[in-house]
């Protein structure tokens, strides 16, 4: 496992974020008119973790090799006499745990919010969850007297009560399944509404309802309309998950940056990069800072356990918490801290995905959705981690194992400062995961262990942090320090700021001959890459936004995002434990692969300015040789 113990801080370019914009012609429930949250079903499930599963040594079913039978026997033992069916979505996960789901029924009709899930491993019950209804079941089947309304009446009720944009005269056409219908002849929905007769647990009793399914774009609803009173909607489920985060948006480095202000962003994820959103892994949906890409929590003890640690939770997925710079101690604003950390890490996941850090490349996700690579490795984000102070770190095991980020409290000021609130810290640490997964391949996390390679690891992290904080009015004459907020030092935590000025930052490749630790070496490498960025901006312009624009060939149209793309692609091309010269060559090769070498002149000019011209040579035990020479014929 590779541990990168440094912190790198960056600010992000100031941008205007428009969250969840209204698009003309789109349909949905206006939340100001109808509060869907008022119809939200209440959770009733219990979960029995592995440590609490009763001893199974005396149970006959443990020897059964069929995990569905094992699970079924468990349900029968826990809920004797209850009618249920096996849901047909059982499978064995890549971790060897089988998952079997059950639905409670009454008179052959589903109780729609009464479920039982059993997890089986090695022929034994691993854990289980249970929300089966144990109250009174109606003595007689409603199907016998058919004393319930027509499903089209239920659609009318849902449309009226919830003010759905559906019109027309519906006609019910029977489908496979007990009392299941497609409702034809309407308009306003993406597809024909459907209705199914189900029971719903409501106020400790069962209500017979029509479950009316309507997809109206911004909302995909299951509305439980009373089967005898169309004006009574017992509950609503919305498949479309809306979440809001009150955070410093991408483009704000820290709370003291000019113009810094928190904003509330709704559903800020990129759908192509995070198809399940940030609060779902495609199987489970969460109302806390947990999802497919990351799981964020407080870790005051500094221990390795995290699943049961505290994290902010909101049933409506509204992550908005008070914070001012004067608040102290940091534990008093841990909800905001975890929210900000979760937000920044997820945005960076989505950006890197667009730049090429995908499932097959070894990115960090629970569910890779059949797109290659190994899953079950979202990033564990520990905020206010008690294992240290005045730093941060990121552990990168091979693909298929969780990355782990530890964000510490900085004690140089009163009140103390939380590194999760500085975007550059988060981006720096996450980039260690990127560079370690790409260099040498996702299965080898030891390819940045040599001194110069490890230094470049720090440099890449500084570079992505700095690239993210570029502002619209910045020029090649703009300098950026690293870590100025947490360290309370306007000069930052590096020897020199990132600058294209050889006066304000005189470092070149020859500087590495005087350095013996990774962070100073990284300062040199990131300085080189900062030159590359501005050389490409000079040719292609600047785009200050969260995500890049690509041309038809998949090339970023702006210089700042093109630089990030080439640096990322270069990581995947370079050898295990590369040196500066090899990494330079890999970036030039990346441009050749992406653009046919259209930027060769700009790249060589930038590299040569900082001593990585064509004559540069690496020497492990002697002095490396720098060169200011641009190859003939390149420019």
Swiss-Prot record:
GO terms for molecular function: metalloendopeptidase activity; zinc ion binding. One of its GO terms (cellular component) is extracellular region. It holds the Pfam family Peptidase_M36. Keywords: Glycoprotein, Hydrolase, Metal-binding, Metalloprotease, Protease, Secreted, Signal, Zinc, Zymogen. Glycans are attached at residue 473. InterPro entries: FTP_domain (IPR011096), Fungal_virulence_M36 (IPR050371), Peptidase_M36 (IPR001842), Peptidase_M4/M1_CTD_sf (IPR027268). Its main location: secreted. CDD domains: M36. It is an enzyme of class 3 (hydrolase). Its EC number is 3.4.24.-. Zn(2+) binds at residues 428, 432. It is found in: Secreted. The keyword Ribosomal protein does not apply. The active site is at residue 429. Residues 20-242 form a propeptide. Its cofactor is Zn(2+). Induction: Expression is controlled by the prtT transcription factor. Disulfide bonds: none annotated. Residues 1-19 form the signal peptide. The keyword Transport does not apply. It comes from the Eukaryota. Binds 1 zinc ion per subunit. Secreted metalloproteinase that allows assimilation of proteinaceous substrates. Belongs to the peptidase M36 family. This is Extracellular metalloproteinase MEP.
């Amino acid at each position: 496992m590779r541990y990168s113990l440094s912190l790198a801080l960056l600010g992000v370019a100031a941008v205007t974020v428009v969250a969840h914009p209204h698009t003309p012609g789109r349909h949905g429930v206006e939340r100001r008119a109808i509060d869907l949250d008022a119809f939200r079903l209440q959770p009733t499930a219990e979960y029995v973790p592995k440590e609490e599963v009763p001893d199974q040594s005396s149970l006959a079913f443990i020897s059964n090799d069929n995990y569905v039978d094992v699970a079924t026997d468990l349900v029968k033992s826990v809920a004797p006499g209850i009618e249920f069916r096996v849901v047909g979505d059982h499978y064995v996960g890549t971790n060897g745990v089988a998952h079997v789901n059950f639905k409670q029924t009454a008179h052959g009709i589903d109780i729609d919010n009464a479920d039982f899930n059993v997890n089986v491993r090695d022929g034994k019950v691993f854990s289980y969850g249970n929300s089966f209804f144990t109250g009174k079941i109606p003595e007689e089947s409603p199907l016998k007297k058919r004393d319930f309304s027509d499903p089209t009446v239920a659609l009318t009720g849902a449309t009226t009560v919830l003010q759905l944009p559906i019109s027309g005269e519906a006609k019910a056409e029977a489908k496979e399944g007990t009392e299941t219908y497609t409702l034809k002849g309407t308009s306003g929905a993406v597809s024909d509404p459907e209705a199914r007769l189900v029971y719903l647990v409501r106020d400790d009793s069962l209500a017979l309802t029509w479950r009316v399914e309507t997809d109206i774009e911004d909302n995909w609803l299951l509305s439980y309309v009373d089967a005898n009173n169309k004006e009574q909607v017992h509950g609503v489920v919305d498949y479309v998950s809306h979440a809001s985060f009150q955070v410093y948006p991408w483009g704000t480095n820290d709370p003291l940056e000019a113009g810094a202000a928190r904003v509330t962003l709704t559903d800020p994820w990129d759908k192509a990069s995070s198809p399940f959103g940030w609060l779902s892994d495609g199987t489970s949906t969460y109302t806390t800072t947990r999802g497919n890409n990351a799981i964020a929590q407080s870790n005051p003890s500094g221990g390795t356990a995290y699943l049961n640690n505290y994290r902010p939770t909101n049933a409506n997925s509204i992550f908005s918490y008070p914070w001012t710079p004067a608040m102290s101690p940091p534990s008093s604003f841990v909800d905001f801290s975890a929210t900000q950390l979760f937000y920044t890490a997820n945005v960076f996941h989505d950006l890197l995905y667009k730049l090429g850090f995908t499932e097959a490349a070894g990115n960090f996700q629970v569910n890779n959705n059949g797109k290659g690579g190994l899953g079950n490795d979202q990033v564990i984000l520990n905020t206010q981690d008690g294992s240290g102070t005045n730093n941060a770190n990121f552990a990168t095991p091979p693909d298929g194992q969780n990355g782990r980020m530890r964000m510490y409290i900085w004690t140089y000021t009163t009140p103390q400062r939380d590194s999760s609130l500085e975007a550059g810290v988060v981006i720096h640490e996450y980039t260690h995961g990127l560079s370690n997964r790409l260099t040498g391949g996702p299965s080898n996390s030891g390819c940045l262990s040599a001194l110069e390679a490890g230094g470049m690891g720090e440099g890449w992290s500084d570079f992505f942090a700095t690239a993210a904080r570029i502002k619209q009015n910045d020029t090649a004459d703009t300098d950026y320090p690293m870590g100025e907020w947490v360290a309370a030092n306007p000069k930052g935590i590096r020897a020199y700021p990132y600058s294209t000025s050889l006066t304000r930052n005189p470092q070149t490749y020859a500087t590495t001959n005087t350095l013996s630790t990774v962070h100073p070496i990284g300062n040199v490498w990131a300085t080189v890459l900062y030159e590359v960025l501005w050389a490409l901006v000079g040719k292609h312009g600047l785009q200050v936004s969260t995500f890049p624009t690509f041309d038809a060939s998949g090339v970023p149209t702006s210089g700042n995002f093109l630089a990030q793309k080439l640096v990322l692609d270069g990581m995947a091309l370079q050898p295990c434990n590369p040196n500066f010269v090899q990494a330079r060559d890999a970036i030039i090769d990346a441009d050749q692969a992406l653009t046919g070498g259209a930027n060769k002149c700009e790249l060589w000019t930038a590299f040569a300015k900082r001593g990585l011209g064509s004559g540069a040579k690496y020497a492990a035990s002697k002095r490396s040789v720098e060169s200011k020479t641009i190859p003939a014929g390149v420019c």
